[in-house]
């Protein structure tokens, strides 16, 4: 097997030129690149994959050690940090950047449409959009400023689907796996799957994935989808749904798709004097303040907001690392999570 030295000798160049060819052939003259390429194919040389070094700021391309959190107004700061699930999301983003000693600053678009001068590539390494201006002209100016900066959009931004940025979908199968694992860790043997609100989506990917994962792990499940006529009044709907649920024997887990269903059913159970703390449950859309309404509640997962925050931070680091090669902005968004409490 030929090595770099032999290839360099046959091509009549030095080893540094051959090394540059393998790193990026555009750094080598076209005629030299063709000569080296022909020799490589002739001798059957295969470049061994280099072991990736530690993920240091220098390797990633961090220069300013500063990332901006873009908000539409100052009131959003108080709103986000008083909202339990979203607070965990943003805190997770902060924690990931702190591991690399990267600070985060708020960049607030003024009510008059002014955009802080700090939002520029000479001041920050990247940006995380939590909310955007509703005025089209201001949003367009903001996008123009962001196109020179590595940027990640988030599910917190109500306008994230109204622009030309790429979309990275959050895998609903992963939520299903975590849900089933959650019940398994609690030693729950049987769960009840509550339908989408008013049975609008009978073949929800999240529920289908949860069924498959429960079957694999060995957790029995009962699906209440279709068990109650969706056309009955809402209060009657939850009463009948609760009636069906209470007939399921040995059910220790409750899997909700919407927090509206969870709120309706748990209210009905509590009105009947049933202690809901005996159940382990999860809701795909449940946020902490919804659960706090019931006082002390059993363990739950609240849509993986923390994991989504970690994913957002890592996505931005990837964007900073490859920004020169892929100058595009990406959106971290989960269709299943769009209906936030």
Please name every model-derived segment.
Residues 1-56:
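N-terminal helix-turn-helix DNA-binding module of bacterial transcription factors
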Residues 54-61, 118-119:
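Short boundary motifs at domain starts and secondary-structure transition points
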Residues 108:
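Surface-exposed acidic loop/strand-edge motifs in secreted or periplasmic proteins
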Residues 58-79:
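Interdomain hinge and pocket-entrance segments immediately C-terminal to HTH DNA-binding domains
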Residues 4, 10, 41-44, 49, ...:
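Bacterial carbohydrate/catabolite-sensing allosteric modules
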């Amino acid at each position: 097997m030929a090595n770099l030295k032999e290839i360099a000798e046959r091509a009549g160049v030095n080893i540094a030129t051959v090394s540059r060819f393998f790193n990026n052939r555009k750094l080598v003259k076209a005629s030299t690149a063709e000569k080296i390429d022909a020799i490589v194919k002739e001798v059957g040389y295969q470049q061994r994959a280099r072991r990736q070094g530690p993920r240091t700021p220098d390797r990633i391309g961090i220069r300013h050690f500063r990332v901006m959190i873009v908000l539409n107004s100052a009131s959003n700061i108080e709103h986000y940090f008083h909202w339990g699930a979203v607070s965990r999301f943003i805190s997770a983003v902060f924690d990931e950047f702190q591991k690399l000693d990267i600070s985060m600053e708020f960049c607030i678009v003024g009510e008059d449409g002014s955009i802080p001068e700090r939002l520029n590539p000479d001041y920050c390494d990247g940006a995380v959009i939590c909310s955007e201006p509703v005025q089209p002209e201001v949003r367009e100016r903001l996008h123009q400023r962001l196109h020179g900066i590595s940027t990640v959009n988030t599910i917190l931004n109500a306008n994230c689907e109204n622009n030309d940025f790429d979309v990275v979908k959050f895998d609903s199968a992963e939520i299903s796996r975590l849900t089933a694992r959650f019940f398994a860790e609690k030693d729950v043997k049987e769960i009840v799957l509550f339908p989408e609100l008013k049975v609008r989506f009978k073949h929800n990917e999240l529920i289908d994935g949860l069924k498959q994962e429960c079957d694999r792990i060995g957790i029995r499940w009962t699906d209440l989808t279709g068990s109650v006529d969706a056309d009955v009044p809402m209060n009657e709907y939850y009463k009948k749904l609760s009636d069906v649920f209470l007939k399921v024997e040995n059910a220790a887990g409750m899997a909700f798709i919407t927090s509206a269903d969870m709120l309706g059913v748990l209210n009905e159970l509590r009105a009947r004097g049933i202690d809901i703390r005996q159940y382990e449950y999860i809701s795909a859309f449940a946020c902490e303040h919804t659960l706090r309404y019931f006082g002390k509640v059993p363990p739950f997962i609240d849509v993986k907001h923390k994991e989504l925050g970690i994913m957002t931070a890592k996505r931005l680091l990837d964007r900073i690392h490859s920004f020169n090669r892929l100058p595009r902005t990406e959106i971290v968004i989960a269709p299943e999570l769009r209906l936030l409490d």
